[in-house]
A protein has these predicted regions:
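Alpha-helical segment of the N-proximal tetratricopeptide repeat
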Residues: 36-76, 80-90
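TPR/TPR-like (Sel1-like) alpha-helical repeat modules
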Residues: 137, 153-177, 187
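Conserved positions within tetratricopeptide repeat
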Residues: 61, 95, 129, 163, ...
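Long, contiguous interaction/recruitment modules in multidomain scaffold/adaptor proteins
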Residues: 1-43, 53, 66
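Helix-start (N-cap) detector for alpha-helical repeat units in TPR-like alpha-solenoids
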Residues: 40-41, 75-76, 109-110, 143-144, ...
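Canonical tetratricopeptide repeat
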Residues: 80, 114, 148, 181-185
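Short solvent-exposed coil/turn linkers within tandem alpha-helical repeat scaffolds
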Residues: 70-73, 105-108, 139, 172-177
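Alpha-helical adaptor scaffolds
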Residues: 49-52, 75-138
């Protein structure tokens, strides 16, 4: 009697599992693989980066250029080309790449920041400030954008604006090292304002 009871339970559980699997279809293996694998573009971009950082930099750049030629909306390829332009001192090309990204993705805070960095290196303080303000408009808590905008305001001797930007960082960042650095910026500005 016990054996038949045990067999009935095992058969019931097995049937329950079979019904469960039949009622809830799973994704085909190829769909799961596709979701977990990087895109072909991402793989190609990674290969190009390795070439640029390795023995064949021009071949890597050519790969990236052909990618944006094939798909002008390939933000990732534009971004990498912009980064390489900054690294190689080609600031005008970098600005153009990041402008393209901003046109395609107006909320891309990082594109504004990189563009602003290129403009800073070109000594285009007003344009850099406007760009960092664009980054802040997309993410009002971006510490990098706030610091850079503060520094540009300092260069333009807009002390109160710089201080306000630095104070914003303090409202959004609890890191003691960051807070100490930002407070040092503010103290420096307070001295400038007192000596005015």
């Amino acid at each position: 009697m016990r054996n038949s009871y045990l067999i009935a339970i095992i058969v019931s559980v097995a049937l329950g599992l079979i019904v469960l699997f039949l009622l809830f279809p799973t994704q085909p293996k190829s769909a799961i693989d596709k979701a977990n694998s990087p895109t072909a573009d991402s793989v190609k971009i990674q290969q190009a980066i390795e070439l640029v950082n390795g023995p064949q930099p021009m071949q890597g750049i050519q790969m990236l250029l052909s990618m944006v030629e094939e798909n002008p909306k390939n933000v990732e390829a534009h971004f990498v080309l912009g980064e390489f332009a900054i690294r190689s001192g080609q600031m005008e090309k970098a600005v153009a790449r990041f402008n393209t990204i901003i046109e395609l993705q107006p909320q891309n805070t990082l594109a504004y920041i990189y563009k602003g960095e290129a403009l800073m290196q070109m000594d285009s303080v007003q344009a850099a400030l406007a760009t960092f303000n664009g980054a802040i408009a997309t993410d009002s808590t971006s510490g990098i954008a706030l610091v850079y905008a503060g520094k540009m305001n300092e260069k333009l001797e807009n002390w109160n604006e710089a201080k306000a930007l630095y104070s914003t960082i303090l409202r959004h960042n609890e890191d003691p090292i960051v807070r100490d650095s930002v407070n040092a910026f503010i103290r420096k500005i307070d001295i400038k304002l007192k000596n005015k």
